[in-house]
Amino acid sequence: MIAGSSGGHILPALAYINNLSLISDPNNILFITNEIGEKYLEKIESKKINKIILNSKNKFFFILNIFLKVSFVFLTNRKINLIGFGGFITTPILIISKLFNIFLLSFNKIYIHEQNVIYGLANQINYFIAKNAFISFPKENMRSKEILVGNFFMNNNKLIEKLDNTFINILLMGGSAGSLDLNNMMLKEIANFNKVYLKKTKFFIQIPESHLKILKKKYTDLIDNNNFVFFSFKYDLNLKEYDIILSRSGSGSINEILYYTNNVYFSPHLISRDQHQKFNLDYFLYHNMSQKNFFIPNKKNLPSQFYFNPLINPHSINKIICYTTR
């Protein structure tokens, strides 16, 4: 499994690894990632999974390390199933695998998984050398290599936080791409919100560590410090207990949130190269699965116990495992 660059690529890869290790020997599973993926390694449930961490900050040494470390793996294993989950790191590794197939008569199978409505730059290249491309969103005209499996997320039986439901609970999550503009949106809403209701509202705010001090001061200038919880990463989110969520529309976030609740306003990360978050959002707006405007509610707004999203299948991971292990 290869993934890097962002949580949107890495988290589906880790979900796949955790499920695969339940039916296959984890000693035979290798996860290749970069320094961003290294932050998520604690989510791997088996301690026996092999890992290669490649530092991608210096591109020359990055490519050199890929060639040296990955070539050794291909030389000592002539029949490997590879799955690229996105990020620049996947392309050179999958290309090397293909070259081994051509020139050294290896029997490697190459697959890719695309989390977004449109292919990212790496997967646009990877598609041409892949045996199959597993896609997350349904579409009318599927290409010959494409197989719809949906998106999938981490273990749904994880420990989750317990919120004080005497408060109106608000969550802001910006993903690994950052949440600065979302925080500015939230600050603007708080500044214009009725101060009486603010006392009954609790905010759970994701802030990049590099901006924590500055943004924390902006929040505490507006409201009592006891009404805030600040975090950079939070693994125990109980999404269905929030009265409103302000979130990026990255593929991982959008699917997991909508599985639990539709009390969400998605805001795309517009500086992304291909605007994939905008296309993700457009898909769900078309299906009336995102609020049209962001506002802080003045009363409890929890989803109905009968809430069900027919487009989100948390068990789609079983389908991709069937295809890649048969």
Where do the PLM segments sit?
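Conserved nucleotide-sugar phosphate-binding/catalytic loop shared by glycosyltransferases and other
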Residues: M1-G7, L22-N65, V149, G174, ...
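Donor-nucleotide binding loops and adjacent catalytic segments primarily
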Residues: N18-S21, I32, I36-E45, D164-I244, ...
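An aromatic- and histidine-rich active-site surface loop
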Residues: G37-K39, N81-I102
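An amphipathic, basic-hydrophobic alpha-helix
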Residues: S56-N81, T91, L99
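Active-site-proximal region of nucleotide-activated glycan assembly enzymes
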Residues: F100-L159, Y286
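Acidic donor-binding loop of glycosyltransferase active sites
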Residues: L239-S253, N263
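Short hydrophobic beta-strand element within catalytic cores of glycosyltransferases
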Residues: S247, N263-D274
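C-terminal alpha-helical cap of glycosyltransferases
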Residues: P310-R326
